[in-house]
Curated annotation (Swiss-Prot):
This is UDP-N-acetylglucosamine--N-acetylmuramyl-(pentapeptide) pyrophosphoryl-undecaprenol N-acetylglucosamine transferase. UDP-N-acetyl-alpha-D-glucosamine binds at T12, G13, G14, N124, S182, I228, Q273. HAMAP family: MurG. It is found in: Cell inner membrane. InterPro entries: GlcNAc_MurG, Glyco_trans_28_C, GlycoTrans_28_N. NCBIfam families: murG.
């Protein structure tokens, strides 16, 4: 009989894409997978395309609420909990995997109530609120980076869609890949279009910014795209990546052995992007520039100062940090339960 596994992940790509990598690895085994997410996250668009049954509940945020809004949120939270209990009773999972986010938090507590083994995975170097709570009750905690949790946890790395990258040889101009995630990053977009140095640029703008960014580039040689489906190919092309420091981006930089200039999102919860970026910077695998310090002069100077030897060394250092077997390691543990 197939093992029933409920994956809980929703809201942002940082939770969804590593969960999807695990789900795809689980498909290589005799398992029955279902997914619990929120009604507003991008999982609604992505998960069904992978032939995985998706359950959704109304997402409720609790941080930064006024008293009235908090009371309303608590009522909605109670309703969402009942919804999730119903999903558990119908599916009857043998084990539950929480990847962070609202539905993972409530689902993890419901798993505890029903005495179903709970496994969690934290993608960032600084744990989110949900996993800080669930870490106390989980049967097993996986973390992407060392020392995220005080309690004993296994460092697996982040599950990535690709396993390796064949870097292209570039003997001419520097290839700069600019990425800001699926939604793009306006500050990075704005400063990148001011670059006036002799390099090759591939700029992923995000859906909302494509037309504006395309219009700002005077050099038609620049490749501008809304979204990059094949990130392995993009990293293979790039000598250096200019990007934010989300957990998945940082892990992809490691696995693809790609040097980076990292501009952490300054308002990320618990400043986790700064600490993600610091892992690469401290290992001389990336260059960290805080957004408040970012100027076109500094960016151009940084790019012009990067030479081939530095690229080679940073690439080697990034790869040393990579955890290429994250999905398999987590799946092997999930399958170990009777």
């Amino acid at each position: 009989m197939s093992k029933k596994i409920l994956i809980m992940a929703g809201g942002t790509g940082g939770h969804i894409f590593p969960a999807l990598a695990i789900a795809n690895e689980l498909k290589n085994h005799s398992t029955h997978i279902q997914w619990l997410g929120s009604n507003v996250g991008i999982e609604n668009e992505i998960v069904p395309k992978h032939n995985i049954k998706l359950h959704t509940v109304n997402s409720v945020g609790l941080r930064g609420k006024s008293v009235v809004s908090l009371i309303k949120a608590l009522f909605l939270l109670s309703y969402a909990t009942l919804q999730i209990m119903g999903i558990f009773l119908k599916f009857k999972p043998n084990i539950v995997l929480g990847m962070g986010g609202f539905t993972s938090g409530i689902g993890g507590l419901v798993a505890c109530i029903f005495r179903i083994p709970l496994v969690i995975h934290e993608q960032n170097s600084i744990s989110g609120t949900t996993n800080k709570i669930l870490n106390k009750i989980a049967k097993k905690t996986f973390q992407a980076f060392d020392d995220t949790f005080i309690k004993s946890a296994t460092t697996s790395g982040n599950p990535i869609a690709f396993s390796s990258v064949d870097k292209q040889t570039n003997n001419k101009k520097l290839n700069l890949l600019i990425i800001g995630g699926s939604l793009g990053s306006k500050p990075i977009n704005d400063i990148s279009t001011q670059l006036n140095i002799n390099i090759n640029i591939w700029h992923q703008t995000g859906r909302l910014h494509f037309d504006a960014v395309k219009a700002q580039y005077k050099n038609n040689v620049v490749k501008v795209t809304e979204f990059i489906k094949d990130m392995a190919n993009a990293y293979a092309w790039a000598d250096v990546v200019l990007c934010r420091a989300g957990a998945m981006t940082v892990s992809e930089l490691m696995l693809s052995a790609t040097p980076s200039i990292l501009i952490p999102l300054p308002h990320a919860i618990d400043n986790h992007q700064f600490y993600n970026a610091k892992i690469l910077a401290d290992s001389n695998a990336g260059i960290l520039i805080e957004q408040k310090d970012l100027t076109i002069e500094l960016l151009e100077k940084t790019l012009l100062n990067i030479n081939k030897n530095q690229i080679k060394q940073m690439s080697t250092n990034a790869l040393k940090l990579a955890k290429p077997n994250a999905a398999k390691q987590i799946v092997n543990y999930l399958l170990s339960f009777d």
